[in-house]
């Protein structure tokens, strides 16, 4: 942000007039200003995020932190004035005029980088999953609220018409009270093999120590074992298919039924090995009910080769089971939400749906929402106040896969399992010396 204008001060004062005793100036850019932005990550999902954010004429990319020189070529071509760093800490220490950042790195660095940025008062667009641990998600949610920062998690479906239709139809009671949900993804971000006993040369231009970040030291393994494309499979760096796709596919469900965190979780299939997430996952959550559900509601997640049982799939009749999606079973009908295909949810199981007319709803631009919210002219639809608890719920399922055939009872207020101390050891993790983060 270039300066704080009288207009921005008046805007904040008006918005906070009813707050008790004191108010403080937000770090938002005034509507007349350009948002000065930095990206953590330069290619892959980071490149996509950069392209979508800079599509706004009101945001300027001024800096990028990327540990691998081989991944900054496009940035140099498209943004010749952008300053490129390798160390995210140096970027945050050097770039004093920033308003905003996106965190689009491997999962294990989402929380640490986002928290360092937030400690500086910067607004954050954070890729899903918001963090790699439940503790990190809770702390980012808390700090975003304390500092009144603009935040958005990168779950673009949240702003899509078909997502919004799921939420509206469920909350309007179109299928009655939701009693059961089954959601799945055919992706298989896992590995049953042991880690290769290799110590390969680090490629020129890659800072392996910075890539590891908060994780423990280990040799580099060539052949795309970790970097750039398979870190999602590894326990210390990714969150498997569940963490990768759960935040997308469970988002409409979580948003629609409004149940918060589960009271219990159980994983039914073999767990991860010492190094890698499982290929196939089946996890059942039980939630206390909400006004949109029966007294309790069960949600089962499947990924890899796991799928809902035949009696559940029978609800959609002759329709093809999508590669990714959800079936929501209500007291007065069924909703089939397709993630990979289909423009709107399909209503089944009742004659009243034959002539049902879908409400008029439009797609929103998830990225533009964020940019305009930073400028003070709008608000985000997936701020950390929403996406933090969503991430916690997803990560609880990831954690549960470590304890197959075990009923885990969760106390969300205390942020711990009440019946399994071994599981509690995975709620929070220690960071490597030199990468500690205040607040985490």
Residue spans of the language-model regions?
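N-terminal secretory signal peptides and thylakoid transit peptides that target proteins
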Residues: 1-16
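N-terminal Rossmann-like dinucleotide-binding module
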Residues: 13-79, 157-160, 170, 253
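Loop/turn elements at helix/coil->beta-strand transitions in domains of secreted/extracellular proteins
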Residues: 33-35, 59-60, 80-81, 97-100, ...
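Hydrophobic residues in well-ordered beta-strands that form the structural core
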Residues: 39, 103, 126, 151-153, ...
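Short, solvent-exposed turn/loop segments enriched in Gly/Ser/Thr/Pro and often Arg
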Residues: 68, 104-109, 130-132, 137, ...
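Beta-loop-alpha module in the N-terminal Rossmann-like domain of NAD(P)-dependent dehydrogenases
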Residues: 82-139
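A contiguous active-site-proximal alpha/beta segment in oxidoreductase catalytic domains
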Residues: 123, 131-210
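Contiguous beta-strand/loop segments that form the cofactor/metal-binding neighborhood of enzyme cores
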Residues: 164-165, 177, 182-346, 350-385, ...
């Amino acid at each position: 942000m270039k300066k704080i204008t009288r207009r921005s001060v008046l805007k904040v004062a008006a918005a906070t007039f009813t707050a008790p005793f004191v108010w403080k100036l937000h770090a938002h850019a005034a509507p007349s200003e350009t948002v000065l932005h930095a990206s953590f990550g330069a290619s892959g999902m980071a490149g996509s995020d950069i392209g979508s954010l800079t599509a706004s004429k009101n945001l300027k990319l001024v800096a990028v932190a990327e540990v691998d020189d081989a991944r900054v070529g496009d940035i140099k071509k498209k943004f010749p004035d952008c300053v490129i760093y390798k160390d995210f800490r140096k970027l945050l220490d050097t770039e004093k005029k920033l308003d905003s950042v996106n965190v689009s790195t491997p999962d294990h660095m989402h929380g640490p980088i986002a928290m360092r940025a937030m400690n500086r008062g910067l607004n954050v667009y954070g890729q899903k999953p918001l963090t790699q641990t439940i503790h990190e998600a809770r702390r980012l949610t808390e700090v975003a609220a304390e500092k009144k920062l603009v935040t958005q998690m990168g779950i673009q479906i949240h702003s899509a018409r078909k997502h919004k239709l799921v939420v509206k139809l469920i909350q309007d009671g179109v299928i009655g009270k939701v009693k059961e949900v089954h959601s799945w993804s055919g992706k298989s971000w896992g590995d049953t093999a042991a880690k290769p006993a290799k110590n390969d040369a680090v490629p020129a231009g890659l800072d392996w120590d910075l890539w590891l970040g908060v994780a423990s030291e280990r040799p580099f393994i060539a052949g795309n074992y970790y970097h750039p494309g398979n870190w999602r499979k590894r326990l210390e760096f990714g969150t498997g298919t569940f963490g990768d796709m759960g935040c997308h596919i469970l988002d409409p469900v979580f948003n629609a039924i409004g149940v918060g965190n589960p009271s219990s979780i159980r994983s039914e299939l073999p767990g991860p090995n010492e190094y890698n997430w499982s290929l196939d996952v089946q996890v059942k959550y039980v939630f206390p009910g909400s006004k949109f559900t029966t007294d309790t509601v069960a949600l089962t997640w499947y990924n890899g080769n796991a799928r809902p049982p035949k009696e559940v799939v029978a609800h959609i009749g002759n329709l093809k089971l999508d590669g990714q999606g959800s079936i929501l079973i209500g007291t007065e009908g069924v909703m089939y939400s397709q993630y990979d295909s289909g423009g709107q949810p399909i209503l089944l199981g009742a004659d009243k749906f034959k002539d049902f007319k879908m409400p008029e709803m439009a797609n929103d631009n998830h990225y533009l929402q964020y940019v305009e919210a930073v400028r003070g002219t709008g608000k985000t639809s997936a701020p950390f106040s929403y996406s933090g608890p969503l991430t916690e719920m997803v990560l609880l399922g990831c954690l549960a896969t470590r304890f197959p055939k075990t009923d885990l009872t969760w106390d969300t207020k205390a942020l711990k399992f009440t019946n399994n101390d071994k599981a509690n050891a995975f709620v929070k993790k220690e960071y490597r010396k030199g990468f500690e983060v205040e607040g985490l």
